Regions:
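A detector for small-residue-rich transmembrane helices and their helix-helix packing motifs
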Residues: 1-170
Length: 170
């Protein structure tokens, strides 16, 4: 029995069913926050400099960062990733899908700190400025892209309609 199966037996009951609904709700909340006060979103980004200076809420709130700031793009993204994420959750199981998503989030945070450490060791520019610029790139966009990739690997013969018209094979 492999490690993931052992973990599922021990802590599988804590897995969050329909995790994509919660993620999409977080994106929508982030979009509303961005629409109401765009400057406040800078307080929610994944910025290692600010985390190391006491703003620990950023370890969680970066998940609220919308991948796009247009309403139509948000709707399309929400529909697409809900379908893809739900299909992956049904085929993998709730626990494994949770491990996939939360693992992606954890490694995004680790990657942000590694990049911050590299910039700090190189001594190029102000760390606060570098952290601010790089924090805008640490969003859940890459996690969403891995969902798309995982779906394409699981269902290579599936087609989606690009712009609701053009069929594209995975």
């Amino acid at each position: 029995m492999n490690f993931l199966n052992k973990m599922e037996r021990k802590i599988g009951k804590y897995a969050i069913p329909n995790l994509m609904i919660y993620l999409i709700a977080a994106y929508c909340i982030g979009f509303v926050i961005y629409t109401v006060n765009p400057n406040f979103m800078l307080m929610l980004t994944l910025s290692p400099y600010h985390i190391l200076h006491g703003q620990v809420w950023r370890l969680i709130t970066w998940i609220l960062m919308p991948t796009d700031t247009r309403v139509f793009s948000l709707l399309i993204m929400a529909l697409l990733y809900y379908q893809l994420g739900s299909a992956l959750e049904r085929s993998w199981g709730t626990f494994r899908f949770n491990v996939y998503i939360f693992g992606g989030m954890l490694f995004t945070v680790i990657g942000a700190f590694i990049l911050y450490g590299i910039y700090a060791a190189a001594g190029t520019g102000s760390l606060e400025t570098i952290s601010l610029i790089s924090s805008l790139t640490f969003t859940t966009n890459y996690i969403n892209l891995t969902i798309f990739l995982a779906f394409a690997v699981m269902y290579p013969e599936m087609q989606i309609l690009l712009f609701f018209i053009i069929p594209v094979k995975m």
